[in-house]
Amino acid sequence: GASGLAQVLGYVRKSFGIAPGAEVTTESNPESTSPEFFEGLLEAGYTRVSLGMQSASSRVLQVLERRHTPGRPVDAAKEARAAGFEHVNLDMIYGTPGETDDDVRATLEAVLAAEVDHVSAYSLIVEDGTAMARKVRRGELRVTDEDVLASRYALIDGVLSVAGFDWYEVSNWARPDGECRHNLGYWRDHDWWGAGPGAHSHLGDRRFFNVKHPARYTQHCTAGALPIAEEEHLSPHDRHVEKVMLGLR
């Protein structure tokens, strides 16, 4: 809950400090939030909230195995704004098997009704080993055609652009001054530290990620050892290519 997130941020502030005016974002599932939750986050020092909306269609949410009701993300976003958050994001997923253009339009209408300043829209990726992948393999679900995905993306961009959102990154739209700073940091080749099981870090020419299992991660940390699972050093050429690629987003 908010108290746990407040403790984490307090530890970061005490150990490393937080720059004045820093963007401090947390992500939540809509069904796990409340007005008191958002008030606690704001009091703790969080400045931005991202909510996993996915879709306004109950049928699509069922396929995605999401637990919230179609209207909960909009209510949660309004609660966050009422608590005092200026920056609120809603995440959309498009291309779910069985989704229609009307489903996407309804989701966009709900997004605009929420009066958020940032929207992320991601094409569904069916990951190997998931229940959805097994259903696709058995023929119970059908993967959305790439041409349909392209038309849905154009639909999303068109609706958001007319509503005053600026497309500033391949999957992200924002109102003026609503751009996500940590998103921009990724694409501008900034450095970042990742803390926690499976977290990735980017420091100059070094790329590494932590062990994924929480118990193993804890064992490393309590033993005073870095919990790094794998590490990669990029050559100057690889860094240049990566910077160009990231800049194209």
Positions of predicted regions on the chain:
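C-terminal scaffold of the Radical SAM
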Residues: 1-249
